[in-house]
Amino acid sequence: MNAQEIIRSLEAEQLKSNLPEIHVGDTVKVGVIIQEGNKERTQPYEGIVIAKRNSGINATITVRRIFQGVGVERVFLLHSPRVESIKIIKRGKVRRAKLYYLRDRVGKATRVKQRFDREL
C-alpha cells in the first residue's frame, strides 16, 4: 500500500454520506457551527450557489447573498465538521457552471428562475 492509497482511505472515512444533491443556481441554507466564547451554536447562512467544486473531500460550494445592500460570498467545504446541515430551499434553472456574472448584477437582476423538475 503506497502513500496515495493510504491518504485516499483516510479521506474516504471522513466523507459525509448524507449530503443532498446540490447544483449551481440552487438556493440553500447552510447550518454552520460557530463558537462564541465557550458556547457553540448553529448559524444559518442562506444564499444562492454560484460555484461548485467537486474534488473528493475538498469539495466546496460558493454561496452568495445580499446582506444590508452588500454582496457577501462564503465558500463552504461540504465535508467539513463545521458544516452541520445543508438544506435546499429551491432549485434554480441556469445554463452556466459558474454564476460569477451575478456579482455585477443588482436588485431584481440577480434572481434565478425556479426549476420544478428536480426534487428538493
From Swiss-Prot:
One of its GO terms (molecular function) is structural constituent of ribosome. InterPro entries: Ribosomal_bL19, Ribosomal_bL19_CS, Ribosomal_bL19_sf, Translation_prot_SH3-like_sf. Pfam families: Ribosomal_L19. It comes from the Bacteria. GO terms for cellular component: cytosolic large ribosomal subunit. PROSITE patterns: RIBOSOMAL_L19. GO terms for biological process: translation. Keywords: Ribonucleoprotein, Ribosomal protein. Belongs to the bacterial ribosomal protein bL19 family. HAMAP family: Ribosomal_bL19. This protein is located at the 30S-50S ribosomal subunit interface and may play a role in the structure and function of the aminoacyl-tRNA binding site. This is Large ribosomal subunit protein bL19.
